[in-house]
Swiss-Prot record:
Gene assigned in the entry: ureA
Superkingdom, taxonomy of origin: Bacteria
Induction comment from the UniProt entry of this chain: By urea.
Subunit text: Probable heterotrimer of UreA (gamma), UreB (beta) and UreC (alpha) subunits. Three heterotrimers associate to form the active enzyme. The trimeric urease interacts with an accessory complex composed of UreD, UreF and UreG, which is required for the assembly of the nickel containing metallocenter of UreC. The UreE protein may also play a direct role in nickel transfer to the urease apoprotein.
Identification of the protein by name: Urease subunit gamma
């Protein structure tokens, strides 16, 4: 199977998101890379489901709470930007202060 660099990046991000999801299900608090991966994954899946950029920007702030991540992580993540493919092309989705 031949994958482009972009496809490899998406696959790696999705895998990291799955790891984060499993750790969260076990009751573990997520670290910085896990939190970013989970939020990014949720945004990419939402785009795939046909949600709009505005919906994703709003929903991106509800993926995680401060209680679900390690101390200091919410302050470290100022914004998360994910390039997603929509029916009308590729767009950049930005979520500012994603963990409240």
């Amino acid at each position: 199977m031949e994958l482009t660099p972009r496809e490899k990046d998406k696959l790696l991000l999705f895998t990291a998101g799955l790891v984060a999801e499993r750790r969260l299900a076990k009751g573990l608090k997520l670290n910085y890379p896990e939190a970013v991966a989970l939020i990014s994954c949720a945004i990419m899946e939402g785009a795939r489901e046909g949600k709009t950029v505005a919906q994703l920007m709003s929903e991106g702030r509800t993926v995680l709470t401060a209680e679900q991540v390690m101390e200091g992580v919410p302050e470290m993540i100022k914004d998360v930007q994910v390039e997603c493919t929509f029916p009308d092309g590729t767009k950049l989705v930005s979520i500012h202060s994603p963990i409240v």
